[in-house]
Amino acid sequence: MSQTPAIQVHGADFYRALAEKAAAVPRRRQSHSLHASQDAAVHRIFNAMQPDSYVQPHAHFEPTKDESVVVLQGRMGLLEFDAQGTVLARFVLGPGEVATIPAGVIHGWCCLAPNTVFFEAKAGPYARPTGAECAAFAPAEGEPGTAEALARLVALATAEKSPVGERFNSAKA
């Protein structure tokens, strides 16, 4: 009698399928959780994004909510902001690169290459960023101005000259 293995292995075929799902949905991103429930103590998530997917800059204020991300394929821009939307740091991450974002740090992501896939780990349970955790200087997903906000994130992430000290200047700034 054959038994399904308990060990899961994910690779190129899985990344390709997840990226295809991301390309087919309006949000232009797709996640796949390895944890059993939203209440799990540790959240382990594969995320696939397309370049036209907008994620509002945000922070996770709960002290246990450090976030670690490993880019598996593609390229991601990562920006660190202060509460007014001034850029404090900028990173461009490629395959095999890891970013650790301490709890309380306002950060924004942007996808810089089609079919980008990354793996994220942080403490559970899941809590969608709300109120002060959502950057007041940037529109929420679905609000007017998100296309301009995404373009600004990409411009800051890919600027030839370091954008440190520049303001986000989105439609809500």
Could you say what each language-model-derived stretch is?
Residues M1-H43, Q56, F91, T146-A173:
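A short, N-terminal "cap"/entry segment at the start of jelly-roll beta-barrel domains
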Residues D82-G104:
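Short acidic-glycine-tyrosine-enriched beta hairpin
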Residues F46-T64:
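Conserved short histidine dyad/triad with adjacent acidic residue
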Residues F46-N47, D66-V71, A99, W109:
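His/acidic/aromatic-lined binding-pocket segments of jelly-roll/cupin-type domains
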Residues P57, L78-E80, A99-I101, H107-L112, ...:
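Short beta-strand His + acidic residue motifs that chelate non-heme Fe in jelly-roll/DSBH
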Residues E62-T64, Q84-T86, P125-Y126:
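Short, surface-exposed beta-strand-loop junctions and turns on beta-sheet-rich folds
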Residues G108-A173:
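Double-stranded beta-helix
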Residues Q50, T64-F81:
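Glycine- and acidic-residue-biased ligand/ion/polar-headgroup-sensing regions
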